[in-house]
Regions:
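Active-site and adjacent substrate-binding regions of carbohydrate-active enzymes
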Residues: 1-194
Length: 194
């Protein structure tokens, strides 16, 4: 803070607290530490902000606002996969339903909308938003376009898709019916929607 830092990005903060016998994700102690971190920062520099990077299901992501006493900003991780899904399947049903269900940001908080990152297209943020058949169709399409799928598996559970490793431009080069000449238009449309 003394050096002029005003923005603190907490990367993968959902995994901050480790406790044996748990998934070590979104534990109450993590939220307590974020509240404490924000309190200390605000006492020292009232205009400093905390941004959380939590690539988790939407409901869990929203919890990182707390009661406007945790993160000032959270990344809207559900937007990229829902937007790609809408543009390659031709249906905006899931994207529209999600958008209409999002609560407005509380006073003093903000959503960071983005449509691509260096991490690929995360799929945990669409758990509970896209049906399994929709995710499977998206995975098949992205693999046809050269994408690779990263998987996650907890002990004793079935492997689940974690993220699609593909550039946004490549992800939008066609539809579920295959590649076509409208990829650039889809890419521009994604930016216009964002």
């Amino acid at each position: 803070l003394d050096a002029g830092v005003r923005v603190f990005r907490l990367d993968a903060v959902a995994f901050l607290w480790k406790e044996s016998g748990t998934t070590c994700v979104n534990l109450p102690q993590t939220h307590e530490l974020i509240r404490l971190f924000r309190l200390i920062i605000e006492c020292a520099q009232p205009d400093a902000i905390v941004i959380n990077e939590t690539n988790v299901p939407n409901r869990e992501n929203l919890s990182y606002f707390g009661n406007a006493n945790e993160a000032h900003g959270i990344y809207n991780f559900s937007l990229p996969p829902l937007l790609v899904h809408a543009l390659v399947t031709g249906t905006s049903r899931y994207l529209s339903t999600w958008m209409m269900s999002m609560p407005p940001a509380q006073d003093g908080t903000i959503y960071f909308n983005f449509i691509a990152s260096h991490d690929g297209i995360g799929l945990r943020p669409v758990e509970g938003l896209l049906e399994k058949a929709e995710v499977d169709e998206l995975l098949d399409t992205m693999e046809q376009f050269g994408g690779r799928v990263s998987w996650r598996q907890a002990a004793g559970t079935e492997a689940k898709p974690y993220e699609i490793n593909i550039a946004l431009r490549d992800a939008l080069q066609g539809t579920t019916r295959g590649k076509d000449e409208w990829g650039l238009e889809r890419f521009l449309c994604a930016h216009a929607i964002m």
